[in-house]
Curated annotation (Swiss-Prot):
The keyword Ligase applies. The gene is mbtM. Residues 146-172 are annotated as: Disordered. It is an enzyme of class 6 (ligase). Activates lipidic moieties required for mycobactin biosynthesis. Converts medium- to long-chain aliphatic fatty acids into acyl adenylate, which is further transferred on to the phosphopantetheine arm of the carrier protein MbtL. NCBIfam families: PRK05851.1 (NF004510). It comes from Mycolicibacterium paratuberculosis (strain ATCC BAA-968 / K-10) (Mycobacterium paratuberculosis). Keywords: ATP-binding, Ligase, Nucleotide-binding. PANTHER family: DISCO-INTERACTING PROTEIN 2, DISCO-INTERACTING PROTEIN 2 DIP2 -RELATED. One of its GO terms (molecular function) is long-chain fatty acid [acyl-carrier-protein] ligase activity. It holds the Pfam family AMP-binding. It catalyses: a long-chain fatty acid + holo-[ACP] + ATP = a long-chain fatty acyl-[ACP] + AMP + diphosphate; a medium-chain fatty acid + holo-[ACP] + ATP = a medium-chain fatty acyl-[ACP] + AMP + diphosphate. Belongs to the ATP-dependent AMP-binding enzyme family. This is Medium/long-chain-fatty-acid--[acyl-carrier-protein] ligase MbtM.
Amino acid sequence: MSELAAALTAAMRTGGSDLVVFDRESAAWRRHRWPEVHGLAEGIAAWLLDRDRPAALGLVGEPTLEFVAAIVGAWLAGAGVSILPGPVRGAEGRRWADTTLTRFAGIGVRTVLSHGSHLDALQALDPSRPDEMVVEDLAVAANTGRRCPEPPAPHANPAILQGTAGSTGTPKTAALSPDAVLANLRGLNARLGVTPADVGCSWLPLYHDMGLSFLLASALGGMSLWLAPTSAFTASPFRWLAWLSESRATITAAPNFAYNLVGKYARRVSGVDLGALRVAINGGEPVDCAGFERFTTAMAPFGFDAGAATPSYGLAEATCAVSVPAPGTGLRFADVSDETGTRRHAVLGAPIPGTEIRISPRHDAPDGIGEIEIRGASMMDGYLGHAPIDHQNWFPTGDLGFFSDDGLVVCGRAKELITLAGRNIFPTEIETVAAQVPGVREGAVVALGTGENSARPGLIIAAEFAGRDRAGARAEVIQRVASVCGVVPSDVIFMAPGSLPRTSSGKLRRLDVRRSLEAVD
């Protein structure tokens, strides 16, 4: 048994806390003791060992008691885990199922567990599914009533096969060892000061590194976790606040867009008490300082402590968390100035224990800014199908940033940097300004440089638009960007809501946007 499996076993068997799962059909919370979850995990492990212990178990579906148990059960059996998302709204079921099983087969997964409509769609592919692919009912595998036999000998399988974002390129699969996963969970819990008295609340998808880490850190820390499916949040985002209030959650996490949404429409909020929250992690995408500050201010009348605001930095290649401020720090800013003015960036704290960060100078980055490089115990062994990495070497993240007196500051992606008239501009600065125009959808704007190696480089802004006056909005976007950012867009292209391509975790696929625009030209 790996140290990761042993640590989770010790925490789950002895803990007095609960896993509380939201059931969408009844709109009710179902409470389960962690020892009960571990008992089902043992059943999953026995089921897998009966089948010669596959190298990795594939999981698909919304979070249930059995789904959570299957993650731990795979590790009890010495197997790895890969979790893939269900179909997005409007997807054709058979095509989604075929793509999902093909993705699993491509990373060596031959055993898949699922439930509900996801299971039906995956099993309907038989006999056209990939060779030797087995798709079974998750509930049947979990409820065998059996205990895991004597722990198998340790082996070299990764604990997690985690897809990377792929927002600026082709997605890859990070192979994470049990030791790396455990180091990251311990480092995160140490930074946050997690105790069994804490209560977590999350609707983050478990196929995303932040959602999976939140779940595992809760189990390892012995705290209760209220876990809702992402679809329940999407259907009614303000439920999140009601869940936080009902659970008396002390820790939660969400991507930036969720905080922006709640802050923007705070007038809809009533009857909630957020006074128990001591940590509200903002991660998974760039932090909009104004939007996060608006959230903290708007939620103050409901008991939210501004010190709970926790903007953080992480990536799948490091399991998840890289830098996180200490609880109580709150939202702090660092200014970046040039000839066009000063822009604020969120300070994302210090490296978690076991992780190191350095800034490597780059000739194409603005003065004082370099590429963020990391190393430490949480690092992946490498990308699946690629050469392994040396954990003693520094890993280039592709992100640009610097250290302020208060911690790490991330300015943007190196690949996304736009060069115009001798200036280097981060697209997030332009996108934030453009999103302030009425009708432009927040979090649905992409700024791209064009012809940067030609005599006439330009700037194109593509945005989802839900207003009526396109011409007026287009003119206002150009005027605002020119005034605030000091560059004049060559073109502003409005698109229908939901049409910009995104990754499975909701990040905009900038490379795909660029390709689409180039194809139109």
